[in-house]
Every structure is written in structure tokens, then in C-alpha cells.
Amino acid sequence: MSLTEKFDSVTVATKANVYFDGKCVSHGIVLADGTKKSVGVILPATLTFNTGAPEIMEGVAGSCRVRLKGESEWTVYGAGESFNVPANSSFDIEVAGEPYHYVCHFG
């Protein structure tokens, strides 16, 4: 997957989604074809996210360590790299130092 730098012709939710006392902030976007995504940033923290739909998390800047539900090993991801999370699952994410900027592709 190549690094997504911008989206054209989108609708943006102006109110941010704020999670974990502000450690993660994102905005939902809808593309012209109806595809939903979110763009956001995670500040230094270790957090656990639950998923409803399958997700592809694409790193835009910074780096993180990720552990998917049921796994014991952590994997490092940086800008231009992505990881897949199944529907109805969860993942732990650890960000240290620089914030981790991401695009979440749903479905």
C-alpha cells in the first residue's frame, strides 16, 4: 500500500472523535463513492481499541507497536506501512515519542 497523502472530494465530520482522554483524536470522512474512513493521530500512550468492522490501519507519520488480539508478539509499523484488524476483534497499540498519524480504512 502506498502512503496516502490526501483525499479529494470528501465530506468531513467537523466534530472530532476523542478517545482515551484525548490520547487519540480522529475525524470521520466519506469519499464520493460512499466509502468511510477516519484520519487521526495517537499521542504517546498504550491503548486498546475494539473493532466492529474489519479495519486497515495505515501509518502516515510516526511509528507504533501493535499486538493483535490473541497474539503475544508486538510488531512495529511506521509511515507507509499498514496492519489489518479483523471485525469484532481488538488490538493494543503503543506510541512512544512522536505522535502516530494514521488513516483507518473500514471494511
Swiss-Prot record:
EC assignment: the record states 2.4.2.1, 2.4.2.2
Say which enzyme class the record assigns.
transferase
What's the domain of life for this entry?
A: Bacteria
Question: What keywords were assigned to this record?
Answer: Glycosyltransferase, Transferase
Q: Does the keyword Transmembrane apply?
A: no
Q: Which Pfam families match?
A: Ppnp (PF06865)
GO cellular component, as recorded: cytosol
CDD domains reported for this sequence: cupin_PpnP-like
Q: What GO MF terms are annotated?
A: guanosine phosphorylase activity; purine-nucleoside phosphorylase activity; thymidine phosphorylase activity; uridine phosphorylase activity
User: Its catalytic activity?
Assistant: a purine D-ribonucleoside + phosphate = a purine nucleobase + alpha-D-ribose 1-phosphate; adenosine + phosphate = alpha-D-ribose 1-phosphate + adenine; cytidine + phosphate = cytosine + alpha-D-ribose 1-phosphate; guanosine + phosphate = alpha-D-ribose 1-phosphate + guanine
Q: Which family does it belong to?
A: Belongs to the nucleoside phosphorylase PpnP family.
For this protein, the record's PANTHER family field holds: PYRIMIDINE/PURINE NUCLEOSIDE PHOSPHORYLASE, PYRIMIDINE_PURINE NUCLEOSIDE PHOSPHORYLASE
Task: Give the HAMAP family listed for this entry.
Answer: Nucleos_phosphorylase_PpnP
Outline what the protein does: Catalyzes the phosphorolysis of diverse nucleosides, yielding D-ribose 1-phosphate and the respective free bases. Can use uridine, adenosine, guanosine, cytidine, thymidine, inosine and xanthosine as substrates. Also catalyzes the reverse reactions.
The name of this protein is Pyrimidine/purine nucleoside phosphorylase
Q: What is the scientific name of the source organism?
A: Aromatoleum aromaticum (strain DSM 19018 / LMG 30748 / EbN1) (Azoarcus sp. (strain EbN1))
